[in-house]
């Protein structure tokens, strides 16, 4: 009898412990937001006077400008990467504060800090939309110099001896900059077809001194990189370090938007999923690196010679903010030759785009299947991932050479559900009709 009583008591204790553990566990979040291409009619950057060809050529030029600000310092073994202030191809509607104050910001996997221009603005670039005034938010709070939020910024943070308030200073590769206070506030985001999600105590940069080439129609940046103050790292365990996006093709209907998912909404599973290791580099923790082994053009496989001669691991950055896929010049030349030799058509020139491999689009152009062989994951590209129509009668290869850095751009990622798991350190790809998500 005593033994039975002890067993029952032990079972009750275990159940009680399990209940308390579940009660104390933080709920996992799952939510989705719209990603608006900067050339969409829903974007403040949209210019109705431009043709689709002009918009695409502008995006190509932005790709080149973005990578040309990747520079290497002689005294460091790892490259030092600077991005232009006006780079990034996708926008998010987010709101800051209580009550929510809406801003349209660039969503950037190549940046960390979420920042916006704030009133009063001592020295700011012209902005079409109203500035966020922290005094109007009941949940806004400047953080102290000794806070974990301030120390997470490391060399980008500074402190005022007068009031112990944490300040930040960010400079971009084109000499633009933003300076202001580090604070925490409520961030609200969501999409047109889901309930808005409120995220409390999110680190933001409240910029009171900003200048350079920032576009007056933009309101700031949402950093989705791998650094300690990025939105992904801040949400941390609540989203299990997971986010994913599905980018609709450039040829989609104008009213269709891409999606970005977080947490339980970001799981990539099912038939057709392939995964590759996500490589972390301590000196460049913002950027998401993958390992590219080779590229196949039809049955011809070309071994990849990456830009990082010290290691073949982590030799290409996956980036949503760059349109083209950019590869080291010599390797790209070999790839272009393989693509050209497999296409039975006359080459055309397009000096406006700067792309070197173009063909007439008036006939039935048959292009080879191109497969990206990442470490452990073969990603087969559709023709729309490898070629872009730059005008009514011209299509061009959506890859090009770069002086040193390799970037897996967003055209190659369109109509794939691309999932990042920063805990398991993997990136997954699943062919998906993104317009139906």
Swiss-Prot record:
Residue span, Peptidase A1 domain: 90-430
Prosegment location in residue numbers: 26-73
GO terms of molecular function: aspartic-type endopeptidase activity
SUPFAM superfamilies: Acid proteases
Entry function: Involved in salicylic acid-dependent inducible resistance responses. May release an endogenous peptide elicitor required for the activation of inducible resistance mechanisms. Possesses protease activity in vitro.
GO cellular component: apoplast
Any one GO biological process: regulation of salicylic acid metabolic process
Protein name as it appears in the record: Aspartic proteinase CDR1
Coiled-coil annotated spans: none
Listed CDD domains: pepsin_A_like_plant
EC number: 3.4.23.-
Pfam families cross-referenced by the UniProt entry: TAXi_C (PF14541), TAXi_N (PF14543)
Stored PANTHER family: ASPARTIC PROTEINASE CDR1-RELATED, OS07G0603500 PROTEIN-RELATED
Leader sequence residues: 1-25
Active site (UniProt): 108, 319
Miscellaneous notes: Gain-of-function mutant CDR1-D (T-DNA tagging) shows a dwarf phenotype with dark and curled leaves, constitutive expression of the pathogenesis-related genes PR1 and PR2, and resistance to virulent Pseudomonas syringae.
Similarity comment: Belongs to the peptidase A1 family.
Cellular compartment(s): Secreted, Extracellular space, Apoplast
UniProt entry keywords in alphabetical sequence: Apoplast, Aspartyl protease, Glycoprotein, Hydrolase, Plant defense, Protease, Secreted, Signal, Zymogen
Glycosylation sites: 93
Highest taxon in the source lineage: Eukaryota
């Amino acid at each position: 009898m005593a033994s039975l009583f002890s067993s029952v008591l032990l079972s009750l204790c275990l159940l009680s412990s399990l209940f308390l553990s579940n009660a104390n566990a933080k709920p996992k979040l799952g939510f989705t937001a719209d990603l608006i291409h900067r050339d969409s009619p829903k974007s403040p950057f949209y210019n109705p006077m431009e043709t689709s060809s002009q918009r695409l050529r502008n995006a190509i030029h932005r790709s080149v400008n973005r990578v040309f600000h990747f520079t290497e310092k002689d005294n460091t073994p790892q490259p030092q990467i600077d991005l232009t202030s006006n780079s990034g191809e996708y926008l998010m509607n987010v709101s800051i504060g209580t009550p929510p104050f809406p801003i349209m910001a660039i969503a950037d996997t190549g940046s960390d800090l979420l920042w916006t221009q704030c009133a009063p603005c001592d020295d700011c670039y012209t902005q079409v939309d109203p500035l966020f005034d922290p005094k109007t938010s009941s949940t806004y709070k400047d953080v102290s110099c000794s806070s974990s939020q301030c120390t997470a910024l490391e060399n980008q943070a500074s402190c005022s001896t007068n009031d112990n308030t944490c300040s930040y200073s960010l400079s971009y590769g084109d000499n633009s900059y933003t300076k202001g206070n580090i604070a925490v506030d409520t961030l609200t985001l969501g999409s047109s077809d889901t309930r808005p999600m409120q995220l409390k105590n999110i680190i933001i940069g409240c910029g009171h001194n900003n200048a350079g080439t920032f576009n007056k129609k933009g309101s700031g940046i949402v950093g989705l990189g791998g650094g300690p103050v990025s939105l992904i790292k801040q949400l941390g365990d609540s989203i299990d370090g997971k986010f994913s996006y599905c980018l609709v093709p450039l040829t989609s209907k104008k009213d269709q938007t891409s999606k970005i998912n977080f947490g339980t909404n970001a799981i990539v599973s099912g038939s057709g999923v392939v995964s590759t290791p996500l490589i972390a580099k301590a000196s460049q923790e913002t950027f998401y690196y993958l390992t590219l082994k080779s590229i196949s053009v039809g049955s011809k496989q070309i071994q990849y010679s990456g830009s990082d001669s010290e290691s073949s691991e982590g030799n290409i950055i996956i980036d949503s903010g760059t349109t083209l896929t950019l590869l080291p010049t010599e390797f790209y030349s070999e790839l272009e030759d393989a693509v050209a030799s497999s296409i039975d058509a006359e080459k055309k020139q397009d000096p406006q785009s700067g792309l070197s491999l173009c063909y007439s689009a008036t006939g039935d152009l048959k292009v080879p299947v191109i497969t990206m062989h990442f470490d452990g994951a073969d990603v087969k590209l559709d023709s729309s991932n490898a070629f872009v129509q730059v005008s009514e009668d011209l299509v061009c290869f959506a890859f090009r050479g770069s002086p040193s850095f390799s970037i897996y751009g967003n055209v190659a990622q369109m109509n794939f559900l691309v999932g990042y798991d920063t805990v398991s350190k993997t990136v997954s790809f699943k062919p998906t009709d993104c317009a139906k998500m």
